[in-house]
Structures are given as C-alpha cells and as structure tokens.
Amino acid sequence: MEVLESGEQSVLQWDRKLSELSEPGETEALMYHTHFSELLDEFSQNVLGQLLNDPFLSEKSVSMEVEPSPTSPAPLIQAEHSYSLSEEPRAQSPFTHVAASDGFNDEEVESEKWYLSTEFPSATIKTEPITEEQPPGLVPSVTLTITAISTPFEKEESPLDMSAGGDSSCQTLIPKIKLEPHEVDQFLNFSPKEASVDQLHLPPTPPSSHSSDSEGSLSPNPRLHPFSLSQAHSPGRAMPRGPSALSTSPLLTAPHKLQGSGPLVLTEEEKRTLIAEGYPIPTKLPLTKSEEKALKKIRRKIKNKISAQESRRKKKEYMDSLEKKVESCSTENLELRKKVEVLENTNRTLLQQLQKLQTLVMGKVSRTCKLAGTQTGTCLMVVVLCFAVAFGSLFQGYGLYPSATKMALPSQHPLSEPYTASVVRSRNLLIYEEHSSLEESSSPASAGELGGWDRGSSLLRASSGLEALPEVDLPHFIISKETSLEKSVLLELQQHLVSSKLEGNETLKVVELERRVNATF
C-alpha cells in the first residue's frame, strides 16, 4: 500500500509537470519523430499497468517496430474492471509542444519509469470522462500525457533497447487499444514533419462512436487544456465550450466521484431511481459490472428526464412567445380594422360633400347660362322693337293714301283765295235751309268786320264742333251746288277719315268745318 500511495503521488506530480509543459503559450516546443502507434503502445503499456517487469520494457523496441494495421483493429483489453475502459478514443492530435527549457534529469526519469513500470491494481487506473459516458469496449485516450513525456522516455529507453534482447514471445502479452479505422488512418497518415502550430486543432468526433446517453454538447473542434490537480485521475479531455445542463445538473453525481476507491455518495434522484427500478444502491468504490450497468441505466434515464424537461421548458417558452405574438398581432389587427372603418366613414362623408358641391356648381352654371340667354333675348327684342318703331315712324307719314294728303294740303292755299274773294258762293251757301239761323244773325257790314267775324266764328265753331259733334256726317253737309273740285276733295277726305279715325279725326273735322264755314259765306 505504501508503494501504491507513493506511486499515486508521483503520478500526481507527473501530471502537474505535464500541465505546465502543455501551456498553449509555449509554441516553440520540440517536434517528435516517434510514430503515433508507438506512442499509443507506450501508453497502453505504462499507464494501464499491463506490463510484467523490466525485461519486458527492454524488449519493447522490438514490438514497437511492427506498425498496427489501420484496417484491422487490435483485440479489446480483457480486464476485471472493463467498465473503466468504456470511453471512446478522443480525437485529439498526438503532437504536443514541449519547451526545451523544461527538461527532466535522469533521476526523475528513472523514478517515473519505475512507477510506470510497476503493475498497479486496476482500481487505481480507473478513468471516466467528466462530461460523457461511453459504451464499453473502447479504451480512454490520454495522448496529451503521453506526448508530453515522449521525449524523456525516448532518451531513457534508448539504452534499455540496446541492452535488452528481443524476445518475440512477449509480443502476445502486449495489450492493444481499439480505435476507429478512420481515426487510425487519420493519425497514421499524419506526418510529424507536417505538424505545425496551426494544425494542432483536433478533428471532430464521429457521431457513431457516441452512446445513447452521451451528451453530444462537445465542440466539434475541442482545444487542449492543461491538467489541474482536481483532474489528476481523469484523462486530459477538453471541456465543452457551451453550457450543458446535464453535466452541471445536481441530479447526477459528478463523473470523477465515480472513480477510484472509497465511499460512493449518490444523489437523491439516483437513489430514488435505483430503488424504483429495483436495483441495490452501491455504497463503495470500485463498482462491479452489475452495479456499473445499473448505475449507467439510471443515469441515462435521469439524463433523458432532464433533457425532456429542458425540451418541454423550451417548447413552453416558445409557445408563450407565439401566444404573445398572436395576441399582439390580433390587437394590432383590431386597431387597423378600426382605422379602416374610420377612413371609410370619412371617405363616405367626403364623397357626399363632393356630390353636393357638384350639384351646387352645376346649378349656378345653369342659372348663369339661363340669365345670359334671357338677357340676350331681351336685348334682341329691344333691338327689334327699336327697328320697328323707327321704320313705323318713317312709313307713318305716307299712310295708305299719300296722294290725297298731298293734294289736300296744297289746295288749301288756292281755295282760300276764291272763298275770300268770291262772295257769290258764300252767299249761295248761306241761303241753305239748314243754316237759316246764320243768315238771320248776320248783318251787312264792312269787309273788315266780316273778316274778323269770319275768323272768330270759325274758331268758335271749331271748338264747339269738337265738343258737341262726335260724329260727322259728311254727306249731310255736302251740297249739290258745290263745284266738282270741292266734291272730289271731300270724298277723298271722307275716305281718309274712315281709314284713319284714330289718328287724323280731329284735324279733318277742323278742316271740314272751316271749309264748310267758308263755303257758306
């Protein structure tokens, strides 16, 4: 036990030194020319504790000359606790930089070789990944630790290879590590000469190598991280970049607590699930195969439960967000509908106002057109009336018988002289029966008095004839003793009086009376 404890301390110290050597800042490390298969065999011989003794180490060079075939993987390791080897090989680059200043002295290398060559119990090398559990049959890959110390091993093992003899019978006892064929091809075809700082990124892990209970939250290109004291017994796997609810869940026991030996403390969820499934609750490490199988089963169930809860939570959040969006869209739709209704009402009122305005404009235009038409008609009627009045005044002087008026007007002057000069006619007219009163009232007088009386009596009779004689009977006053000239004039005047009673009735009466008076004298 003392040897075991001292070996564990050296391993811890060795891992600490390796974590210092694997700092990403030290890029000027040495490149190794050792093949990847040899490094892998060294790790399987030293770390897993399957070596027998030092003579086997001396014959290691003979066995490492044979390169494993990528297409024919080696058989699995058959150990008592094979569950500790149930991890997939990590797709990590085997090339790691080691600073030239951080070299080991011969004593440290010899002590480390002694602990590595010592056969440890299987419980001390039990390893399990921090974030995943893989199906059995695949050995863990801790190539980071191996490549970090590959140079001291080569320096120390070179004299051993020269001094030891080749025993081919020991090759059957060399444990082999099973790798995926494509991964082996990838690493074996990767030449150390082509290695550089930019090519240190690890290839993505194939999805076929994951088990059903794997988390699948690892980054496709994991980076190399330095070791810490808390991760001494776990392989150097890169931690996932994204947050994982399963790895940090309080319902599951941390993977590093399931390693090593000692009391085993499980979570309440794991205990409850084990009891519900009818499995016994393990209390100490290391676990047996049945206990490990049962624990893996219930851990898988718990992970599925956690993932289902997470998916339901995300679905609920998504549905809540969708409901909120639907509600906001519905409210917005209602508001838009109200706005559309308001706009429709406004448009309807504007159309009504436009129709009213159009009717008013059309009415005003029709009225103005009517007024203009009436004004034009009125002007035309006035012009026509003016022309009618003008032409009527021109033709009014001539009348229907213009010759009678022409003959009557100039005949007044020559007829007045014989009436005044001829006394015989006037005497003959005065002797007329009907005018006897005139003869009685008349008396012999001088010619001057007769003329004055003649003018005064003619005026009086003219005025009395206008008032007392509304109708004149010309044939009653015409005497057969008158001359033919007087008869023709009277006939024409009588016809003219009949035709124009309204216009020249008064003037004709005055002329007839004057002529009658003159004729009587």
From Swiss-Prot:
A motif (S1P recognition) lies at residues 427-430. Residues 296-325 are annotated as: Basic motif. The modification Phosphoserine is found at S93, S191. Residues 400-521 are lumenal. One of its GO terms (cellular component) is nucleus. Residues 336-357 are annotated as: Leucine-zipper. It comes from the Eukaryota. Residues 196-264 are annotated as: Disordered. It is a single-pass type II membrane protein. Residues 1-378 are cytoplasmic. GO terms for molecular function: cAMP response element binding; DNA-binding transcription activator activity, RNA polymerase II-specific; DNA-binding transcription factor activity, RNA polymerase II-specific; RNA polymerase II cis-regulatory region sequence-specific DNA binding; transcription cis-regulatory region binding. Residues 294-357 form the bZIP domain. Keywords: Activator, Developmental protein, DNA-binding, Endoplasmic reticulum, Glycoprotein, Isopeptide bond, Membrane, Nucleus, Phosphoprotein, Signal-anchor, Transcription, Transcription regulation, Transmembrane, Transmembrane helix, Ubl conjugation, Unfolded protein response. There is a cross-link at K178 (Glycyl lysine isopeptide (Lys-Gly) (interchain with G-Cter in SUMO2)). Transcription factor involved in unfolded protein response (UPR). In the absence of endoplasmic reticulum (ER) stress, inserted into ER membranes, with N-terminal DNA-binding and transcription activation domains oriented toward the cytosolic face of the membrane. In response to ER stress, transported to the Golgi, where it is cleaved in a site-specific manner by resident proteases S1P/MBTPS1 and S2P/MBTPS2. The released N-terminal cytosolic domain is translocated to the nucleus to effect transcription of specific target genes. Binds DNA as a dimer. This is Cyclic AMP-responsive element-binding protein 3-like protein 2. It comes from Rattus norvegicus (Rat). The lineage of its organism: Eukaryota, Metazoa, Chordata, Craniata, Vertebrata.
